[in-house]
A protein has these predicted regions:
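Motif-centric detector for short Cys/His coordination patterns
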Residues: 2-104
Length: 104
């Protein structure tokens, strides 16, 4: 199929969202849908557990939207969720993560 990132960039309303973890480290994550802007607010703090749970909902919806539109799921949303879960595992569920910004 070729470069799937290029495919999504041309056809899917994608967004990057930047987070600051409780230890001060920052990380950017990809969503193949703008759904994250409906569930999160830039500049807001979230307990790690809530951030992970809400991200899971967003990535599931994003995957469904890609599947409905193109007939296949989105590997990028699965990879995003894996990255979020891996990073979040370093912190207590009640620690705060900040969603710093959305980038289109």
């Amino acid at each position: 199929m070729g470069d799937t990132r290029a495919f999504y960039r041309r056809r899917v309303p994608e967004v990057l969202f930047d987070v600051r973890w409780p230890d001060g480290s920052t990380q950017s994550f990809y969503s193949p849908s703008l759904i994250v802007e409906d569930y999160f607010r830039a500049g807001a703090n979230y307990p790690v557990a809530e951030f992970v749970d809400t991200s899971r909902v967003c990535m599931r919806i994003a995957d469904q939207r890609v599947r409905q539109k193109y007939g296949f799921g989105c590997a990028q949303s699965v990879a995003t969720m894996a990255g979020i879960e891996q990073a979040a595992a370093r912190f207590a569920s009640t620690d705060e993560v900040t969603l710093e910004a959305f980038r289109r």
